């Protein structure tokens, strides 16, 4: 595979296309790298996927102004994602075989639960998540990003303290985005929305306890 990339000039062509299609916009460049890594990862393990994406994508990412450390952390992170991404999802398929579970259901459940993998590489660039900034910014980033990922999991499962209604689900989705995005005032706004949902659900739980049994969460078993 590496010989094909080198002899055909595919690496240089893809690097040029990545720069051209993204228009030099870093957000779109990271998104395109995610898609390339996802496609390569359907048939290759993490190591070869990283090597090939580094050959094909790293020059273009450096050319549009991304730091070297962040470029390779993004490529490594998305390469790891190949193990749980359909349609191959090697790790999920192995787990399904061990558990004697439905392979397709296990694969898509693993993909759903690993959604944080898709978000974190963007944070590597837009936030000091790699500990390359002032210590106060790093602490705020770690706390807000951790909260954002927890809230995004609650959004995907439609469950915080109890099952979320449509209004609460919308607030959870908005809260997770605001907690992950850089400006501090947006993080505070995200916490406010999370507090509203938490208060609303706790009130509903208290009301249900007075009138009947509380709804229990359903575990997603592949």
Language model: regions and residue ranges:
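Alpha-helical transmembrane segments of multi-pass membrane transport proteins
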Residues: 1-222
């Amino acid at each position: 595979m590496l010989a094909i990339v080198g002899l055909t000039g595919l690496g240089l062509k893809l690097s040029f296309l990545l720069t051209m299609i993204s228009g030099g916009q870093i957000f779109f460049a990271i998104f395109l790298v995610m898609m390339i890594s996802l496609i390569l990862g359907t048939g290759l393990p993490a190591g070869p996927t990283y090597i090939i994406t580094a050959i094909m994508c790293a020059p273009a990412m450096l050319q549009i102004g991304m730091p070297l450390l962040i470029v390779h952390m993004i490529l490594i992170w998305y390469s790891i994602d190949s193990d749980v991404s359909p349609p191959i999802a090697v790790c999920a398929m192995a787990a399904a075989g061990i558990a004697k579970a439905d392979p397709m259901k296990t694969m898509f459940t693993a993909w759903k639960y690993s959604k944080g993998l898709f978000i974190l590489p963007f944070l590597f660039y837009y936030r000091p998540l790699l500990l390359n900034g002032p210590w106060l910014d790093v602490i705020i980033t770690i706390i807000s990003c951790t909260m954002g990922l927890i809230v995004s999991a609650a959004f995907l499962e439609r469950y915080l303290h109890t099952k979320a209604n449509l209004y609460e689900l919308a607030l959870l989705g908005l809260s997770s985005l605001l907690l992950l995005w850089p400006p501090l005032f947006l993080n505070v706004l995200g916490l406010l929305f999370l507090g509203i949902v938490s208060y609303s659900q706790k009130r509903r739980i208290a009301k249900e306890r007075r009138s009947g049994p509380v709804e229990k969460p359903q575990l997603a078993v592949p």
